[in-house]
Amino acid sequence: ELEFRSMQAKLFGKKAPEARKSPLPADDLFAPAQAEQLPAEAPAAPAADARQNGSGQMDLFEERHLKTVDDFKHEYIIADTEEARSAMVAELEKHDSWCFDTETTGLNPLTDKLLGVAFCAEPHKAWYMPVSGPADLEAVRPLLEGPAEKTGHHLKFDLEVLRANGIRVKGPFFDTLLAHALIAPGMKHGMDLLAENLLQYSTIKLKDIAAPGARKRELDTSGIPVEVMGKYSAEDADITLQLSAILKKQVKESGMEELFRTVELPLLPVLADMEFTGIRVLPESLEEASVKVGAI
C-alpha cells in the first residue's frame, strides 16, 4: 500500500506526494539502507519547538527545547564479553517485546561489514554488542529467531544485514518508520526527526562521531571507538523503543492498525528476502506492463 501511491494517483486522480530530493527516502521500502548518513540537503533548523499534535507535526509558535541523552539517567552497556552477552540475553528473554538496531560500515546491507547490534527492552537501558565474528552473533541467535516482537526503525535494512550474516530474524515486527509513514504520509520519517517531534529529544548524530567517507555524503564508521559507537547505537535502540510506544497508540487511533499488522508489517521479511535473493525479470514483459499502466 505504501509502495503504490503513484498508481493510486493514476487510477483515482489523487495527487501523489511530491518526491523527496534525498537519494535515500526514508519511507521507501526498496531503498538500500537506513543509515544515518549525511542528507542530500540539510534541512534548516526550525526556530520552533516540535510539539506533537498527534502525528509529529511541529507547532511553529513554540520555543524549541530539546533534551539529550545526558539529561536522563541511563544505562548503556557494552556487551563485549561472554559474561556480558549472557547477562544481556537473560535480561532480554524476560520481555515479550524489545528493540534492536544494527551498525554497519556502509549503506549496503548485503555487502558492508556488521560492526555491532544494540538491544533495548525498557527506556534508558540498552546494550551494544560489538560483532567481530560469527561466534558473537551465535549468542543472540535464539533471541533474534525467537517469538518476541522485534521493534526497529527501517527494519528491512536490519533484517537484510543479519540475513547476510547467517541469521533470519523472525517476527512479529514493529517498524517505527512504517508506522509513521502510514499515519503521516506527507511528512519525513527519519528517526532523528521523529525523536525531536514526538519526544522533544535531540539524538547523537553519526556525522558528529564518524569520519567522512570515500564517497560524497557517506561516512566512515569503521574507525569509531567501541565506547562511542556503543553509546550512539544504544541510544538509537532506546529512542526507537520510546517512539514505538507513541506510534503504536497513534496507529490504533488512526483506525489502520489491522492494515498495518496484516499487510504492511508482514511484507517486511518478504521484501528483505527479495532483495537478498534477487529476482529475475523479463525486460519485454516489464515494458509491456509499463505501457499498459501508462495508458490507464
Features from the language model and the residues they span:
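Long, highly charged low-complexity segments
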Residues: 1-117, 131-142
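A structural signal for well-ordered alpha-helices, especially hydrophobic packing surfaces
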Residues: 8, 99, 244, 248, ...
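Active-site-proximal helix-loop-helix substrate-binding element of RNase H-like nuclease domains
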Residues: 65-76, 108-253, 263, 267-271
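Membrane-interfacial loop-to-helix junctions in multi-pass inner-membrane proteins
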Residues: 255-258
